[in-house]
């Protein structure tokens, strides 16, 4: 439903509408990218400890989806903990790339990667990208650009070390659309650790590569950091985004999304969710989700061509417990618009995803 006065209809000042769709085939943990009129969607299905990943696409912005393509070897992916699942990127010539935490014993969990075949009809057999930096726990991430570069990130201890303080962010890079990856190396060597069971989010575009992750300095400084590279991942600069003094693993996730005016980033801190604009390797003008927070988690952000922003998050989720999904539209000046919504019945272990249509309306997927 649109909430706009008749006075404004003729001049196009009606705010964007928000619709919701459920993940196809009862899946969970959707990851969505809309590019060139195609909505790319992956999801998880099966037992949370050992399940399957599937990919579908839509050419009518979620009204219908294609027949699912299997992504992984059955049982080689996990959904448990919400933040260890698959992530999605679309690179040169629309090729789809996927990376996820493998389902394996702690200490030898692989960072798995696959891509859509040249024919576009199936996914290649998955590959483990870890050579030396074992110790995967919280979810990794990936990004791809239009020049054929693919970047996969994860955090793990320095080889031979243990503990969150000794965790670092690692990068494996491909320059040929994911055909071959270089061995992993440190992306950022500042000794601030990484929150062991927390996720990451990576994004690449013409401005460079950006990565959000949570530190674990002295085990209680679990701050959000933004890493940025302008040289195709050879080096990264880091900036602290938000401080959180907590001596526990908070199992958080982040999001980064492109807009007509640059990038937006979203994160969680002290049981509240925020988003802000990425500028010169920093995040500026953070905005909190409105209202009284009730254990808000798993934020996502999307923006349309009019400069409006959809911000969504979950409320009340916990270990083995679902909750609700909440959302708020913000106008081009960053002020809350009339579109505020909530939906109960958010599934256990799931996530929410969002994208904008060409007409400016938004779609939430959960």
PLM region spans:
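Bacterial N-terminal signal peptides
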Residues: 4-12
């Amino acid at each position: 439903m649109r909430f706009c006065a008749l006075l404004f209809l003729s001049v196009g000042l009606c705010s964007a509408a928000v619709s919701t769709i459920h993940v196809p085939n009862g899946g969970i943990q959707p990851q969505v990218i809309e590019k060139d009129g195609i909505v790319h969607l992956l999801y998880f299905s099966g037992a949370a400890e050992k399940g399957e990943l599937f990919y579908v696409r839509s050419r009518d912005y979620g009204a219908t989806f294609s027949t699912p393509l299997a992504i992984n070897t059955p049982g080689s992916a996990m959904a448990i903990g919400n933040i260890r699942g698959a992530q999605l990127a679309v690179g040169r010539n629309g090729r789809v790339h996927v990376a996820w935490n493998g389902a394996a014993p702690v200490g030898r969990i692989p960072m798995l990667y696959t891509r859509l075949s040249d024919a576009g009809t199936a996914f290649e057999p998955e590959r483990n990208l870890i050579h030396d930096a074992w110790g995967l726990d919280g979810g990794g991430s990936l990004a791809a650009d239009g020049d054929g570069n693919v970047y996969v990130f994860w955090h793990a201890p320095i080889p031979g070390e243990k503990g969150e303080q000794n965790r670092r962010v690692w990068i494996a890079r491909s320059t040929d659309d994911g055909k071959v990856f270089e061995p992993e190396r440190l992306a950022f060597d500042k000794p601030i650790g990484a929150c062991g069971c927390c996720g990451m989010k990576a994004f690449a575009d013409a401005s460079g590569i950006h990565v959000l992750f949570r530190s674990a300095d002295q085990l209680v400084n679990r701050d959000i950091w933004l890493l940025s590279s302008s040289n195709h991942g050879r080096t990264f600069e880091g900036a602290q985004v938000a401080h959180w003094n907590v001596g526990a693993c908070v199992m958080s996730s982040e999001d980064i999304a492109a807009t007509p005016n640059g990038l937006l980033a979203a994160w969680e801190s002290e049981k509240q969710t925020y988003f802000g604009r990425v500028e010169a390797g920093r995040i500026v003008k953070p905005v909190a989700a409105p209202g009284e927070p009730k254990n808000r988690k798993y934020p996502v952000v999307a923006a349309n061509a009019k400069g409006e922003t959809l911000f969504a998050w979950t409320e009340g989720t916990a270990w083995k417990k679902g909750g609700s999904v909440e959302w708020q539209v913000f106008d081009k000046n960053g002020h809350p618009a009339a579109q505020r919504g909530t939906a109960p019945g958010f599934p256990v272990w799931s996530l929410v995803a969002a994208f904008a249509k060409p007409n400016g309306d938004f779609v939430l997927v959960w």
